[in-house]
C-alpha cells in the first residue's frame, strides 16, 4: 500500500493520529520493535518525510519515541551529517502531542550516558552559546523553562492553525540556528597566539571561571562598601 501526502499538515496529522495505530511488533536485528508491517508504506512514508522536510546540509530520520518529552510516539529528527542520527546528542526535532493536537518544533540535546550534574552544566553551556548566536529568539520560539536538565528551544503549533508556508519559515529559522551552533561550536577549533589549538569547550570553561571570579570580586567590593 502507498499513501501520498499533499502537504506537511496532512503528513503531520497522519503521524499524530494514524501512524501509531498501524504499528505492530516486528522482529528486527535489534529484537522486537514497533514497525509498520507494510514495508512499502514504511519506506514511502520515510521518503516523503525527507522530501517534505528537505533542508540544505541536514539529514532527516523518522524516529519512534522516546523524544525529549519521553512520549512513546513518532517524531522526526534533523541533524548534520557529522552528527549522524544525533550521535553528538544535538539535533532539531519535530514531535507530536496527540492529546493537544499540536506539532512541536524544537532544538534539543540528548541526555543519555551523562550524570545529572554534567547535563545541568551542559544545559547552561548550550543556552549561553545559543544566546551568543541569537540574543532574542524570533518567530514565537522560546526556551522551555520547565526543562532544568536540558536545553529546549521550542514552538508549539496547533494542527487546526497549521500553515505549510509559516511552518516552512519556522523550520528554516530553527534549522539555521542549529546549523550556526554546529558551525561555531560543534567542531570548530581556535588558533591562539601561542599557536596551540584550543577548543570552544576549553574557551567556554575559562569564560565560566572568569564570570565566577568577577562575581566574587563584585561581592567583595560590595562588602567593602558596607564597612
For the regions a language model picked out, list residue spans one by one.
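Long, solvent-exposed, polar/charged low-complexity segments
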Residues: 2-26, 30, 38, 144-191
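Charge-dense, low-complexity intrinsically disordered segments
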Residues: 32-39, 161, 197, 201-204, ...
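Well-ordered, non-membrane alpha-helical segments in soluble/globular domains
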Residues: 37-47, 119-130, 170-171
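Charge-rich, low-complexity N-terminal segments
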Residues: 3-74
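Flexible "arm" and connector segments at domain edges
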Residues: 189-227
Amino acid at each position: 500500500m502507498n499513501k501520498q501526502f499533499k502537504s506537511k499538515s496532512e503528513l503531520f496529522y497522519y503521524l499524530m493520529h494514524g501512524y501509531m495505530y498501524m504499528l505492530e511488533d516486528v522482529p528486527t536485528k535489534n529484537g522486537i520493535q514497533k514497525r509498520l508491517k507494510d514495508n512499502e508504506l514504511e519506506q514511502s512514508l520515510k521518503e516523503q518525510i525527507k522530501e517534505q522536510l528537505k533542508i540544505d546540509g541536514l539529514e532527516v530520520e523518522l524516529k519512534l519515541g522516546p523524544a525529549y518529552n519521553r512520549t512513546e510516539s513518532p517524531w522526526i529528527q534533523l541533524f548534520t551529517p557529522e552528527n549522524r542520527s544525533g550521535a553528538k546528542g544535538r539535533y532539531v526535532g519535530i514531535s507530536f502531542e496527540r492529546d493537544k493536537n499540536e506539532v512541536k518544533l524544537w532544538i534539543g540535546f540528548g541526555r543519555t550516558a551523562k550524570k545529572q550534574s554534567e547535563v545541568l552544566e551542559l544545559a547552561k553551556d548550550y543556552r549561553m552559546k545559543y544566546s551568543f548566536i541569537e540574543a532574542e529568539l524570533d518567530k514565537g520560539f522560546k526556551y522551555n523553562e520547565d526543562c532544568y536538565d536540558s536545553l529546549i528551544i521550542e514552538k508549539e503549533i496547533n494542527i487546526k492553525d497549521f500553515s505549510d508556508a509559516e511552518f516552512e519559515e519556522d523550520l528554516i529559522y530553527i534549522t539555521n540556528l542549529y546549523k550556526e551552533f554546529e558551525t561555531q561550536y560543534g567542531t570548530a577549533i581556535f588558533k591562539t597566539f601561542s599557536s596551540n589549538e584550543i577548543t570552544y569547550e576549553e574557551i567556554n570553561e575559562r569564560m565560566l571561571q572568569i564570570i565566577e571570579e568577577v562575581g566574587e570580586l563584585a561581592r567583595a567590593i560590595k562588602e567593602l562598601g558596607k564597612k
